[in-house]
Swiss-Prot record:
The encoding gene: Rgs18
SUPFAM superfamilies from the UniProt entry: Regulator of G-protein signaling, RGS
Residues bearing PTM Phosphoserine: S49, S216, S218
GO cellular component, one term: cytoplasm
Physiological role: Inhibits signal transduction by increasing the GTPase activity of G protein alpha subunits thereby driving them into their inactive GDP-bound form. Binds to G(i) alpha-1, G(i) alpha-2, G(i) alpha-3 and G(q) alpha.
High-level lineage: Eukaryota, Metazoa, Chordata, Craniata, Vertebrata
GO molecular function annotations of the record: GTPase activator activity
Keyword Methyltransferase among record annotations: no
Main subcellular location: cytoplasm
Domain RGS: start-end pairs: 86-202
Alphabetical list of InterPro entries matching this protein: RGS, RGS_sf, RGS_subdom1/3, RGS_subdomain_2
Domain of life: Eukaryota
Compartments where located: Cytoplasm
Keyword Protein biosynthesis among record annotations: no
Name by which UniProt lists this protein: Regulator of G-protein signaling 18
Length: 235
């Protein structure tokens, strides 16, 4: 009988230890969850702090973009009106190319007009060595796969240029330039004629703020909301 009591007593002690161990593990899990939440909150506060230090958060990017839109030109409204007659009229005028370039920069697609300008400059080359150097420069910058400012060309056009780049002629980029010109005429040019940059030139209207800053503020607000919710956990 005494042996039985000792046996059951031993079982009770084991059960008590198991319960105590379970409670410790359960409590440790909660503590670990709270620590992870605090770490996440701290990381998000750090990200928000870095974001607040960025110049564009305070509107400098917006300011520079607005300055780009409002850049003054000496072109008259009468001359600017002619640019709406055709894309060729726009490209034939230096101020037209400049205004169109500024517009494309607001759409982050200025590589097209830069390629067109580079081709125009290339066709003015008179020395063979200069022709080769400029041809390679254009190829490296605009044509080859993964070029820093690669333009949208079909495979055949790119292949022809690639094969002739070692011995270029003044017409090596004609097909590519024509292709890019068509893309701009049927796409970007139509939007340019409705843009603030062009309307400002022909009407002298005040520039409306671009929506670039609003996007930045929306992003910042979302970041702040995440941090705010995690700070509540922290507290």
């Amino acid at each position: 009988m005494d042996m039985s009591l000792v046996f059951f007593s031993h079982l009770n002690m084991c059960e008590s230890k198991e319960k105590t161990f379970f409670k410790l593990m359960h409590g440790s899990g909660k503590e670990e969850t709270n620590i992870e939440a605090k770490i996440r909150a701290k990381e998000k506060r750090n990200r928000l702090s870095l974001l607040l230090q960025r110049p564009d958060f305070h509107g400098e990017t917006h300011t520079s973009r607005s300055a780009l839109l409002a850049k003054e030109t000496r072109v008259s409204s009468e001359e600017a009106l002619k640019w709406a007659e055709s894309f060729d009229k726009l490209l034939s005028h230096r101020d037209g190319v400049d205004a169109f370039t500024r517009f494309l920069k607001t759409e982050f697609s200025e590589e097209n007009i830069e390629f067109w300008v580079a081709c125009e400059d290339f066709k003015k080359c008179t020395e063979p060595q200069q022709l080769i150097l400029k041809a390679k420069s254009i190829y490296e910058k605009f044509i080859k796969n993964d070029a820093p400012k690669e333009v949208n060309l079909d495979f055949h056009t790119k292949e022809v240029i690639t094969k002739s780049i070692a011995q270029p002629t003044l017409h090596s980029f004609d097909a590519a330039q024509s292709r890019v010109c068509q893309l701009m005429e049927h796409d970007s040019y139509k939007r340019f004629l409705k843009s603030e940059i062009y309307l400002h030139l022909i009407e002298g209207r005040p520039q409306r703020p671009t929506n670039l800053r609003r996007r930045s503020r929306s992003f910042t607000y979302n970041e702040f909301q995440d941090v705010k919710s995690d700070v509540a956990i922290w507290l």
